[in-house]
A protein has these predicted regions:
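A compositional/biophysical signature of low hydrophobicity enriched in polar/charged and small residues
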Residues: 1-289
Length: 289
């Protein structure tokens, strides 16, 4: 059930550029395209979803790299009909908290306060990069799990905790947490609810959505002629009926009538981007006979 236990860093604070990407892929080519895209070290999440745009993934590139040029590398793959870049325009919430105890279910209402983070410009030094490389590793379950990192970095364990606390205060580290495999933990209905929100209401609706404990992620993203939905929210439920009811409960409270739920039908990749680590990347254009 446990996927990883490590520091979770903020992509943008580290100078990385990232975007959600939606693709329409010919169904018989979908698996091949997904597996080729998975080879890119900047791809952390990659899902098949039940929609005309049937492949959704996140792509992050390090400082100095061009995200659009990096995305262009995938265009040589056979079977891609459309590609839509959907970068974050406003972030309202990020951070999955799965309720593992049924009898402690939260009422579906906007009851959470937004976490306040000091907005400090952060330019990572080589020392910072070395620290991040070490602390993004999956933690070993031992008596003193930070001892090895401290030795590798020439620090004490207390100094590690102080630096992590500082990173959290300035928003460089979002949290130090365990990441669960949603499906194995019983959360089989993972829905991306996309909302068509009037422009003047985007911030209000986004903040309200972010206050629902059931919503793990919430963003404003750009629209296209064939994609009118500008606010994205994620929910994680144990059944499709529960997800449908939860969506209706949320919808009544935010008063947005035009929306869709896109469920993930297949997970092709879910991992953490390894920051400040060099990787080679090559793709095979077509399916080999």
């Amino acid at each position: 059930v446990l996927r990883q236990l490590s520091a979770i860093f903020d992509t943008r604070k580290l100078g990385y550029t990232s975007s959600l990407v939606a693709m329409e892929i010919e169904p018989d080519k979908l698996e091949h395209v997904a597996h080729q895209i998975n080879k890119h070290p900047g791809v952390s999440h990659n899902y098949e979803r039940e929609h005309e745009f049937n492949l959704w993934f996140t792509l992050a590139v390090p400082p100095g790299s061009d995200l659009e040029k990096e995305l262009e590398k995938f265009s040589k793959l056979d079977g891609i009909k459309k590609t839509r870049m959907l970068p974050t325009l406003q972030l309202f919430k990020i951070g999955v908290k799965l309720d593992m105890v049924d009898d402690k279910k939260h009422e579906v209402k906007p009851s959470e306060e937004k976490k306040k983070v000091t907005d400090v410009k952060f330019v990572p030094t080589e020392e910072d990069k070395e620290f991040i490389r070490e602390l993004q590793k999956d933690m070993e379950i031992v008596d003193r799990p930070f001892q090895k990192a401290a030795e590798n970095l020439g620090m004490t364990e207390d100094q590690i905790f102080e630096k992590l606390h500082h990173y959290e205060e300035i928003g460089v580290m979002r949290r130090y947490a365990a990441i669960l495999r949603h499906r194995e933990a019983g959360f089989t209905a993972n829905g991306m609810i996309v909302w068509k929100v009037p422009k003047e209401r985007i911030t209000e609706v986004g903040n309200k959505l972010g206050a629902f404990p059931q919503v793990s992620h919430c963003y404003e993203r750009p629209v296209y002629p064939d994609w009118p939905y500008n606010v994205f929210s994620m929910i994680h439920c144990k059944s499709f009926d529960e997800a449908g009811q939860m969506t209706k409960d949320i919808q009544k409270q935010i008063a947005v009538n035009d929306y869709k739920i896109l469920f993930s039908s297949r997970e092709f990749k879910k991992t953490r981007v390894e920051y400040f680590v060099e990787h080679e990347f090559e793709i095979e254009k077509t399916i080999t006979a």
